[in-house]
Regions:
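A short helix-loop-beta-strand connector motif used in the catalytic cores of GNAT acetyltransferases and
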Residues: 38-51
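Short, conserved alpha-helical segments within structured domains
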Residues: 26-30, 48, 75, 120
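Acyl-donor (CoA/ACP) binding surface of acyl/acetyltransferases
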Residues: 1-20, 53-121
Length: 121
């Protein structure tokens, strides 16, 4: 994820359906801060949320990665993702989450990762 991904990530993070678990949808300033926070996570932790790109075109359709979250009173690693609405339910989040899982187990000391998601009929 870089500043060059702003326009693509704005389409994702400003969507109220995608951001329903956040206090608000992101405006332009919040998206810029989101990008900068992830760049800082790369520096501090060596990981964060990465841009999810289509293999065929390179188009950014969201983000997915590993972040440290306060869960049940403890800081724990969690896989998180946001995928553009028109690309949802096509396996991109699953593929990205599996890649993050594999990367995490091969490159960090973590042996447990959390992932929260909704199950649809």
């Amino acid at each position: 994820m870089t500043e060059d991904d702003f326009s693509a990530l704005y389409k994702v993070l400003s969507d109220s359906d995608i951001m329903k678990y956040y206090p608000c949808v992101f405006d332009e300033n919040r998206v810029r801060n989101w990008i900068f926070r992830n760049i800082e996570r790369y520096r501090v932790f060596g990981f964060g949320l990465w841009a999810v790109c289509l293999k065929e075109t390179g188009d950014v359709i969201g983000d997915c990665g590993l972040t440290m979250q306060l869960i049940d009173g403890e800081i724990k690693p969690e896989i998180g993702y946001h995928i553009r609405a028109d690309k949802q339910r096509k396996g991109y989040a699953k593929e990205a989450a599996i890649a993050v899982r594999d990367w995490t187990f091969n490159n960090t000391p973590f042996n447990v990762i959390l992932l929260l998601y909704e199950i649809y009929k």
